[in-house]
C-alpha cells in the first residue's frame, strides 16, 4: 500500500525477528509435473544443484503448509476462490453497505452474503467486528483443511500450537461506532466491548480462546505487509522449537465510511466509478490508484516432523522469508527499489534458494502510479533474467485487502503450485514499457512452479517477502 504524494515525514525502521542461521545442506531433486487440481504437490526446483544455496533439512525446522482457510469477496471456500481467480472474474462492485454516493470513490471488493454459521455462536456473531469474524472463520476453516477440525484438534499438544493473525486496521467498525456514541450520546453509551474488539491482537486471542491453543499468541500490524510478517514470525517460532504448529495470516474489514474516507483523504484510491471492475489495473499506464478489498487469509504452518507424525495433508512448503524497512517515507516507496530488492535477496538466502530457481512471483502490484514500477525495479535488481519468470497480480480481481492481502495471495500462490495454473492479471490494456515480465495478462496460463515468492509492502516502508515450493520429502 504505497505510492502517495505526501509530506516528507520519515518512518523509523522496524525491528524484525531474525532467524537463527543453523542451516544444513540439501540436495535438490527434480520430479515430474504435479497432478492438476490436487492439493498435494511434489514439484521441486529444476535448477542445478551444484551451486544451489543450502536449504533446511532438519524435519524439526522445515516448515510445511497443511491447511488453508479464507474469507473473500469470492466466498469462503479455497477451491472456489481460486477457480474465480483462474477465470479472471472481478470481485469489484459499487459499495452498498452504506451510502457512498458523496465519496469520490464509491466502489470496492465488498464481501456480501457472509455467514459465520457453524463457526461463531449467535451472541458473538452479533457483537464481533467483521475483522474478528473473518479471522475466526478463516482460522477454523484452515484447521478443517489441515484435518484438525472439531475434536481432532485434541490430538495435538495445544501448549505448542499458537496463533499469529494480524490486521492493519483492527476492529474499525467497533472503533467508529464507539467514537460516534461518545460524540452523540456521551461516554455512558460506549460499549464495554469497544476496547477489546477494536485492538489488533484480539483476533488471535479469540481464536486461541475458542480452540484452547496455548502456544505463541499475538498479532503483528505492519499495514499491508501484515500477513507476510505473520508468516515469517510464525515460521521462526516453529524453527526455534517454540511451537509445533502455528495458525498465521491476516484479516481486515475496512470498507466502512471512515475507512473509505481515510484512504480517499490519502489520495490513494482509484476513482474509476463509471467502470469499477476495470479500476484495479496493475502495471497499466492508465492506473489511478488501488481498490479497497476485505477478507482474511490464513495458513496452518507446522514443522515437518509434527506434520508427518500426525499424517497431515501437506500442500506446500514454506521455504523462508524476510522483512525490512525502506526507511524512506511514510507512504511512498523508494524509487530505486533498494529496500524491496534487499528484502527479496534476504528471503532467498533464508530459504536456501538461488534467484535462478524462482520462476513465479505473486506481486504486491496495487495499481498505484509509483508503487507498481518501484516493485518491478526491485525485482530486476535481483533477477537478472526475466524471461523465465511469470508475475501476476491477485489484487486486479479482489482489490487490496490491506492486512489480509498477503494471506489471500499466499493461498493463491500455493494453489498455483498445486494446480500448475497461474491466474491472470486482469485489466491489462496498455502495459508500462518497463514491465518486460510475463504478467499473465487477462488469461490464465499453465506453468509448472519451481519456487514462488509472494511480495507484500505497507505504509511505513514495511517490506516482506515469503517463498514457497511444492513439498518433497
From Swiss-Prot:
Q: Which PANTHER family match?
A: 3-OXOACYL-[ACYL-CARRIER-PROTEIN] SYNTHASE, MITOCHONDRIAL, POLYKETIDE SYNTHASE-RELATED
Q: Which family does it belong to?
A: Belongs to the thiolase-like superfamily. Beta-ketoacyl-ACP synthases family.
Q: Which NCBIfam families match?
A: fabF, PRK06333.1, PRK07314.1
- Taxonomic classification: Eukaryota, Viridiplantae, Streptophyta, Embryophyta, Tracheophyta
Which EC number(s) does the record attach to this protein? Answer: 2.3.1.41
Q: Known InterPro entries for this protein?
A: 3-oxoacyl-ACP_synth-2 (IPR017568), Beta-ketoacyl_synthase (IPR000794), Ketoacyl_synth_AS (IPR018201), Ketoacyl_synth_C (IPR014031), Ketoacyl_synth_N (IPR014030), PKS_Beta-ketoAc_synthase_dom (IPR020841), Thiolase-like (IPR016039)
Q: Does the keyword Ribosomal protein apply?
A: no
Q: Where is the composition biased (Polar residues)?
A: 1-10
Task: Provide the disulphide bond pattern.
Answer: none
Q: Where in the cell is it found?
A: Plastid, Chloroplast stroma
- Catalysed reaction, written as an equation: a fatty acyl-[ACP] + malonyl-[ACP] + H(+) = a 3-oxoacyl-[ACP] + holo-[ACP] + CO2
Among the GO biological process terms of this entry, one is: fatty acid biosynthetic process
Q: What is this protein called?
A: 3-oxoacyl-[acyl-carrier-protein] synthase I, chloroplastic
Function, please?
Answer: Catalyzes the condensation reaction of fatty acid synthesis by the addition to an acyl acceptor of two carbons from malonyl-ACP.
Q: Show the segment(s) annotated as Disordered.
A: 1-26
Residue ranges of the Ketosynthase family 3 (KS3) domain?
A: 60-470
- SMART domains recorded for this chain? PKS_KS
* One cellular component (GO) term of this entry: chloroplast stroma
Amino acid at each position: 500500500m504505497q505510492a502517495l504524494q505526501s509530506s516528507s515525514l520519515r518512518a523509523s525502521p522496524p525491528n524484525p525477528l531474525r532467524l537463527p542461521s543453523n542451516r544444513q545442506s540439501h540436495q535438490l531433486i527434480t520430479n515430474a509435473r504435479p497432478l492438476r487440481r490436487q492439493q498435494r504437490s511434489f514439484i521441486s526446483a529444476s535448477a542445478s544443484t551444484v551451486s544451489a544455496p543450502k536449504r533446511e533439512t532438519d524435519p524439526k525446522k522445515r516448515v510445511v503448509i497443511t491447511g488453508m482457510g479464507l474469507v473473500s469477496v469470492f466466498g469462503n471456500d479455497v477451491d472456489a476462490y481460486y477457480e474465480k481467480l483462474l477465470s479472471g472474474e472481478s470481485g469489484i462492485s459499487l459499495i452498498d453497505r452504506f451510502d457512498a454516493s458523496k465519496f469520490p470513490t464509491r466502489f470496492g471488493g465488498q464481501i456480501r452474503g457472509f455467514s459465520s454459521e457453524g463457526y461463531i455462536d449467535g451472541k458473538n456473531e452479533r457483537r464481533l467486528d467483521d475483522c474478528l469474524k473473518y479471522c475466526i472463520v478463516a482460522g477454523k476453516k484452515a484447521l478443517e483443511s489441515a484435518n484438525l477440525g472439531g475434536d481432532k484438534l485434541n490430538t495435538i499438544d495445544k501448549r505448542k500450537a499458537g496463533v499469529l493473525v494480524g490486521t492493519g486496521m483492527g476492529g474499525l467498525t467497533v472503533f467508529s461506532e464507539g467514537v460516534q456514541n461518545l460524540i452523540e450520546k456521551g461516554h455512558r453509551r460506549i460499549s464495554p466491548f469497544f476496547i477489546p474488539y477494536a485492538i489488533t491482537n484480539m483476533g488471535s486471542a479469540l481464536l486461541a480462546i475458542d480452540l484452547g491453543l496455548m502456544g505463541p499468541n499475538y498479532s503483528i500490524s505492519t499495514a499491508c505487509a501484515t500477513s507476510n510478517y505473520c508468516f515469517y514470525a510464525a515460521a521462526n517460532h516453529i524453527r526455534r522449537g517454540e511451537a509445533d504448529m502455528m495458525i498465521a495470516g491476516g484479516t481486515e474489514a475496512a470498507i466502512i465510511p471512515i475507512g473509505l474516507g481515510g484512504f480517499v483523504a490519502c489520495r490513494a484510491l482509484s476513482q474509476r466509478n463509471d467502470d469499477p471492475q476495470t479500476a484495479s489495473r496493475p502495471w497499466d499506464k492508465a492506473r489511478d490508484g488501488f481498490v479497497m478489498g476485505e477478507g482474511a487469509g490464513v495458513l496452518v504452518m507446522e514443522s515437518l516432523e509434527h506434520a508427518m507424525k500426525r499424517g497431515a495433508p501437506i500442500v506446500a512448503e514454506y521455504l523462508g522469508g524476510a522483512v525490512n524497512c525502506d526507511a524512506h517515507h511514510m507512504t511512498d516507496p523508494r524509487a530505486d527499489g533498494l529496500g524491496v530488492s534487499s528484502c527479496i535477496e534476504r528471503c532467498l538466502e533464508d530459504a536456501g534458494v538461488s534467484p535462478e530457481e524462482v520462476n513465479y512471483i505473486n506481486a504486491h502490484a496495487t495499481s498505484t502510479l509509483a508503487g507498481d514500477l518501484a516493485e518491478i525495479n526491485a525485482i530486476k535488481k535481483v533477477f537478472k533474467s526475466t524471461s523465465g519468470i511469470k508475475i501476476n497480480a491477485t489484487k486486479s480481481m479482489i482489490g487490496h485487502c490491506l492486512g489480509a492481502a498477503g494471506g489471500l495471495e499466499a493461498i493463491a500462490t500455493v494453489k498455483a503450485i498445486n494446480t500448475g495454473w497461474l491466474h491472470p492479471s486482469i485489466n491489462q490494456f496498455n502495459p508500462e514499457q518497463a514491465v518486460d515480465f510475463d504478467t499473465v495478462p487477462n488469461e490464465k496460463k499453465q506453468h509448472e512452479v519451481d519456487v514462488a515468492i509472494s511480495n507484500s509492502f505497507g505504509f511505513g516502508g514495511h517490506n516482506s517477502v515469503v517463498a514457497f515450493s511444492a513439498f518433497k520429502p
